[in-house]
Amino acid sequence: MKKSDFYYDLPPELIAQTPLERRDASRLLTLDKRTGATEHHVFHELPDFLNEGDCLVMNDSRVIPARLFGTRPTGGSVEVVLLRDLGGGDWECLTRPGRKTQPGTHISFGNGELTAEVIRAEADGNKVLHFNYDGIFLELLDKLGKMPLPPYIKEELTDKERYQTVYSRDPGSAAAP
């Protein structure tokens, strides 16, 4: 299988920039396993396609404002996206620019109320950062962080709650499903 097998044209005007007011009006693509035919529907029609014994899996993870903008001691800017909580204040992260965030690099966020040190680089290019702070980490993220929107979403997010799934409860996702 080649990566090019997954390339396709997607006109920009078909990419929703904001969530629909009525979530059950979102589009639903169905596949008939017997014929291979696909059909377009709307989400509120989902019960029409379910059968007794079908299993639905609900994603109840809340997206955290995992995108942080900080500065290095040199004054250079750093973007950090939290990917995975490793415990003890350590997080696996994406950093930009990656070359400028080598182990030992210190980063300050906000007015210094949240700081981090790059403690190691992973083979895949991700970095492990150790965060230092007083208080509750998720509260600092709510104050300092932004939702990590995908690059094809160009509009600024105005309501963090609209980016959550309707089932969201437990904080931890770095992006919406």
What spans do the regions from the language model cover?
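A cross-family signal for N-terminal binding/gating loops and helix N-caps
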Residues: M1-P177
